[in-house]
């Protein structure tokens, strides 16, 4: 189990784009911009995972 001794260190590491654990004063007021390439890559990974899962089920 890992314990973070310095709360400021934890907030500094998790404050990007309003991640959970960041305090409200360090969160940016605007959401992170959505990159279309990242969205396509995420969709491709989901489709590949589903196809791999179906292949595994068929091989059982």
UniProtKB/Swiss-Prot annotation:
Membrane-topology descriptor: Single-pass membrane protein
The protein, known as: Protein BNLF2a
Subcellular localization, as worded in the UniProt entry: Host endoplasmic reticulum membrane
GO BP, sorted A to Z: antigen processing and presentation of endogenous peptide antigen via MHC class I; symbiont-mediated suppression of host antigen processing and presentation
MF terms (GO), sorted A to Z: protein sequestering activity
Keyword terms: Host endoplasmic reticulum, Host membrane, Host-virus interaction, Inhibition of host adaptive immune response by virus, Inhibition of host TAP by virus, Membrane, Transmembrane, Transmembrane helix, Viral immunoevasion
Region (Disordered): 14-34
Subunit structure: Interacts with host TAP1 and TAP2.
TM segment ranges: 41-59
Protein species of origin: Epstein-Barr virus (strain B95-8) (HHV-4)
Composition bias type Polar residues, residue spans: 14-26
Sequence similarity: Belongs to the lymphocryptovirus BNLF2a family.
Function, in words: Participates in viral evasion from HLA class I-restricted T-cell immunity. Associates with host TAP1 and TAP2 and prevents TAP-mediated peptide transport and subsequent loading.
Domain of life where this protein originates: Viruses
An annotated GO cellular component: host cell endoplasmic reticulum membrane
């Amino acid at each position: 189990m890992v314990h973070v001794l310095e709360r400021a260190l934890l907030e500094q590491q998790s404050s990007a784009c309003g991640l959970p654990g960041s305090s409200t004063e360090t969160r940016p007021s605007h959401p992170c911009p959505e990159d279309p390439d990242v969205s396509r890559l995420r969709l491709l990974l989901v489709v590949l995972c589903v196809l791999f899962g179906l292949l595994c089920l068929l091989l059982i």
